[in-house]
């Protein structure tokens, strides 16, 4: 799979987050000969104080990650975990898999421990 990743917003340690995303996506996505686009935007906050949102289809996914919730900033580790969670949803869109919060919550810590700060 050819992954085209775009990080928008004021990311702290942008290179680390970018590599983290690539590491996860290359781990979880199937080895197919096609292009996918993953656009990730870091915002001050998200609707309903959520940590993030993901939407898209099998070719392009849009992820929003919040820096804060209820006016409290997420730590770098929390941002990474939230990003891992939304990348599981990206996988679900790209592979046309069922959209499952259970899967995302079940894998977010495993992927964060495997790839964050390695």
Task: Describe each PLM feature range.
Residues 13-36:
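Zn2+-dependent metallopeptidase catalytic core
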Residues 2, 38-46:
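Propeptide-to-catalytic entry region of secreted or membrane-anchored zinc metalloproteases
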Residues 78-86:
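Short alpha-helical catalytic segment bearing the HExxH-like zincin motif
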Residues 13, 75, 79, 96:
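Conserved acidic
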Residues 95-118:
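Post-HExxH zinc-binding segment in Zn-dependent metallohydrolases
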Residues 24, 86-87, 111:
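Amphipathic alpha-helical segments in well-ordered regions
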Residues 1-8:
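Acidic/histidine-rich, surface-exposed loop or edge segments in extracytoplasmic proteins
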Residues 43-77, 90-93:
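Active-site scaffold of zinc-dependent metalloenzymes
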């Amino acid at each position: 799979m050819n992954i085209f990743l775009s990080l928008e917003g004021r990311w702290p340690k942008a290179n680390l987050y970018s590599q983290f995303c690539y590491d996860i996506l290359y781990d979880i996505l199937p080895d197919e000969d096609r292009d996918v686009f993953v656009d990730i935007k870091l915002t001050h906050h998200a609707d309903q104080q959520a940590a993030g949102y993901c939407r898209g289809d099998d070719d392009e996914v849009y992820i929003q990650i919040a820096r804060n919730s209820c006016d409290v900033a997420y730590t770098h580790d929390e941002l990474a975990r939230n990003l891992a969670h939304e990348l599981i949803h990206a996988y679900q869109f790209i592979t046309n898999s069922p959209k499952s919060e259970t899967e995302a919550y079940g894998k977010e810590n495993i992927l964060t421990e495997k790839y964050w700060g390695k």
